[in-house]
Amino acid sequence: MKKNELKPAVVFEQFAKINEIPRPSKREEKMIEYLKNWGESRGLGTKVDETGNVIIRKPATKGYEHLKTVILQSHMDMVCDKLVDVEFDFDRDPIKTYIDGEWLTAEGTTLGADDGIGCAI
């Protein structure tokens, strides 16, 4: 399997973009800005509250307005851990991913899928 074959493609394409953004705990400013711009560029109601939560509202699809609201939530930061012999700056460097058998993994660092994939959805 190749990275461009991962499904759903739109989620993994977004996850790849997110992995370009440094987002250590307590230093999520770049991720906040990315999500804010993403929502605003699509004309969605977007705001950042006083603690840095990004709230993006999308109206219901036509014909589904009568259904209950769905809320998706995920955190923006990631666990910053690396192998001892790997040089990596979590404040600057992008996460480099690759396929290992059936798994998407990272080169010498944590993957950031907790919860980068949640943000990608």
What is each residue range found by the language model?
Residues 64-121:
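Active-site metal-coordination/substrate-binding segment of hydrolases
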Residues 16-19, 39, 43, 80:
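Structural signal for hydrophobic packing residues in well-ordered secondary-structure cores
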Residues 12, 16, 36, 119-120:
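Predominant activation on well-ordered alpha-helical scaffold segments within soluble catalytic domains
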Residues 21-23, 58, 74, 108:
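Short glycine-centered, acidic/aromatic-flanked micro-motifs in structured strand/loop junctions
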Residues 9, 29-30, 113, 120:
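Residue-level recognition of alpha-helix initiation/capping sites
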Residues 2-26:
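N-terminal capping segment at the start of a domain
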Residues 24-68:
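A non-catalytic alpha/beta surface segment that caps or lines the substrate-entry region
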